[in-house]
């Protein structure tokens, strides 16, 4: 009888501890544009202890920006809330295996994520072609 009660307690404790992580973690697929049709990726969205949105963007099969037509120098990650201008979040670097990762934290809950190919490392606005996109609906 004690074993059954202990198992129930442990199961309950696990559910209580894991539920918040499951409730906040969500994976959104990135949609590739015709500029990079073979690219794949996703955005893992979580929440930190302060209620901010944690973003972990992962891509694979994304060609180096210099191999695009027209060639670019950098991939830039942008966030855009509805009815506002996109804001640059930083560079997405692609390694020799055509994979890359980008991590950041934001106060935004519902927003679009896009990746563009740019000639400047710190552009004020997206000028180059969009290569990947996703819509985050965290609510």
Each PLM stretch: what is its role?
Residues 11-20:
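Bacterial N-terminal signal peptides
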Residues 2-11:
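Bacterial N-terminal signal peptides that target proteins for export
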Residues 2-3, 23-139:
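N-terminal targeting/export leaders
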């Amino acid at each position: 009888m004690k074993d059954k009660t202990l198992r129930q307690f442990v199961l309950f404790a696990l559910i209580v501890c894991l539920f918040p992580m499951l409730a906040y973690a969500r994976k959104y697929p990135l949609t590739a544009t015709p500029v990079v049709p073979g690219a794949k990726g996703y955005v893992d969205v979580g929440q930190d202890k302060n209620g901010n949105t944690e973003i972990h963007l992962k891509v694979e099969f994304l060609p180096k920006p210099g191999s695009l037509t027209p060639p670019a120098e950098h991939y830039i990650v942008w966030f855009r809330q509805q009815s506002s201008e996109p804001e640059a979040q930083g560079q997405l670097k692609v390694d020799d295996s055509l994979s890359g990762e980008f991590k950041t934290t934001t106060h935004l809950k519902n927003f679009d994520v896009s990746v563009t190919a740019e000639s400047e490392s710190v552009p004020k606005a997206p000028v180059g072609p969009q290569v990947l996109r996703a819509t985050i609906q965290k609510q």
